[in-house]
Structure formats: C-alpha cells, structure tokens
Amino acid sequence: MKAFGDEDTIFEDMDVLNPNEQTYQPESLPEREVELDQIHSALRPATMGSTPLNLIVYGQSGQGKTVGIRLKTDQLQEYAADSEMDLTVVHIRCKGMDGSYHVLTHLVKRLREKRFGPGEELPSGHQRKTLLNMVIENLEKVGGTVIVVLDEIDAIGDDDYILYELPRSNPDGVRLSLIGITNDLQFRENLDADVRSSLGEDEVRFEPYDADQLRNILARRAVGALRDTYFEDDVEDYQHLRSEILTDDTIPLAAALGAQDTGDAREAIRLLFRATRFADDRSETTVTEEHVREARDFLETKAIESGIQTLPNQRMLALMAVTYHGIQGNTPVTTTPIYTQYKTFCEYADVNVLSNRRFRDRLNDLADTNVLNKRQGRGRGDENQYSLAVDLDTALENLPKESERLGDVAMVLREQGGVADK
C-alpha cells in the first residue's frame, strides 16, 4: 500500500487542471475578449447610476459563458467597492430545478443570505405569486443595484413565469438586471413574445472554440499546473509553450478531441487532467499521446455508465429490453421483439406501456446518447436494429440496484447474465 507524502509528482498545482469551475476559475479569457466586451457594455450603465441591461448569454457547454459572467460581475463588484456603489450580485444555478417555483425559492434564500448571512432555509408551502412577492420584498430590503444571474436557465423548460414577472416587477429603490445563461441556442426564440419583451434585446453568443483556441487554453492550464512547464518570452500561447513533462503531441491531441464535437474547453481540460493523473499515479515523468487516448476511453466509459444510472424509467426499460436480447445472444435485434420484451417488463414493474411509436423514440434517444448502437433499416418497411454500445457486463452493472425503482427487473437480468447484484 502506498504511503502519503512519499511519492514524487509532476504537478505544481493540480487544481489549475481541474475542470470543476468551483475548484479553479481562470483570471482571464483571452479567446473571449469580444464576448466579454459585449457583457461589459450591458453592465456598464451600473457605473453611471443607471440600471444594467437584461442579458441572455448563449453557447454550448464548455464555452466560457459562466466564467465570463463571473469575471465581469466580479470586476464590477471591485469597482463598486472602490467607488462606494451599492451593488449586489446573486448567482443561481438552475440545473435540477424544473420550473420557476424552485428558482424563486432559491432566489428568496439567496437574497435573505445577502441580508442576514449564510444558513437561511428554502421557503416552502407558498404559492408562486407569494414567492414572487417575497423576492420583491427582499430586493427592496437589499436595495441599490441588484444583478440576478440565472445559470442554465433552460432547465425550467416551458415555465417562464419568473422570466416574465421578475423583469417587470419594478421593486422600489432597486435597479434590477436579469442575466440568463443557457446552453439552448434556440432558448430566446422559444419564449413567448411578452417574455422576450420583458428580457430586453441584449444577447451574447459564445461560439464553439476551435482546436487552436483549445491548444492555447490547455497550454495556460498546463503552465499553472505542471512542473518544468513554462511560456517562452512570456508569450502565453501554445506556440511558446515549453515543457519537460508534456510530449509534443499531448496537448494537440487533447485539443483536437475536444474540438471534434462541440469545441468544449471543459472536456478538453478534463482529458488532459485525466491523462496527467494516469501518468502521475504511475510515477511516470512524461504525459504522452497514449495517456490522452487512455483518458478518452476512460471518460467515455464513465459518461455512458453515468448516463445509464440516471436514465428515466421508460428509457431504462427500453435499455433493459435490449439488454435481455443481448443476454440471449440475439443482437442486433429489430424493434418488434424489443417492444414485446419491453411490454413484459412494464407489466412486471407495473409501469404504463408506451405506444410503439413513442417506444421507438426512446430507443432512438438511447442511440443518440451512445448507450445503444442503431443500424438503419435498408428500405421502407425494414425495421431498425439495435444493440448495446457498451459491453454486456457494463450495462448490467449499471442498471438499478435491487432496492431502487425497477430494481426487481434489473435483478432478474443480472441473474440471467451471470452478474451478481451489488
């Protein structure tokens, strides 16, 4: 067994390579100067005694949206402290909140914490209108300029009550600005016209990073995180990176893999972080292309496992039906026998049976998220064929446990597949 403190490491500061924004936030985003200037323009009225503009920030995951807003609101707060400006910024992460009601409860809590300090409880048992009035009351108690940032606002779905009512609330003595951050590029277009009018016209789009930009981002992270890694002539880009830890192809491969899909910087950073950890855990002194490829395979498997574990019931039952045929050695298998087995599982688990068409949609959802492989039918009337995109043991091990919803069905499958229930 290894002893703590006895091992050499290639890390100088591991946190800098951690993709978790709560662990490390960069002090600048050189690739996003245009977008930061647009955010600056929307917030600048606050420095002139006016109300900052409402703003919607768009972009796919890992494009710097949240970090960009935090950098500019932090900068504005520093200005406010120096100029004795009355400014309050409230950040709400909406992921996991399925409507305006939950966003309002968290907003009440955060505003109370701005007034009284940490530890305030979420309000419960109130009507939506009452919660809105509680928000307005707390805004008026806080006073001054208040910027409310709603991150991942698309999580609330079609329930845009807060987006309509809050910008129109006009609390006394408050200059209120609402900033929505979303991964949904069609978010604004899907809102009602009245809601779009309430939010105003300002918007900022974060386009996907390209491979060159990702190389520069990874280079800056590497310099902060790794020993014997630096920029030549103090020029902070990949071309001036010098490292005794990273081989020449390590960062280009991580950047290329990150750029392949959506230009997600977080995914590229996660790849390099995992690759570097593989090398460091084995007491190796260099991080190579092979470490990056190993990291890619590892993270893809972990993502699929996590995706299986969090599937909604109907998708889980569809996956179980395909898994059943995988155990029998019958895959790839057409839709009809999968649907037949799905109905059997629904009856066993006392779950409503979807129509054949809606069931096919669930199979396609699983294929779109790389849980299933899909083979298109060759012509009209030919059914699509499906098989597991992961090995059978991985699928079985990540189905619900015996004590969980659908666990009884999963236990039967694991017994048939020769995998012990854990």
Residue locations for each model-derived region?
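Conserved catalytic segments around the Walker B and adjacent sensor/switch elements
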Residues: L55-I56, Y79-G96
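Conserved C-terminal helix/linker of AAA+ ATPases
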Residues: F278-L299
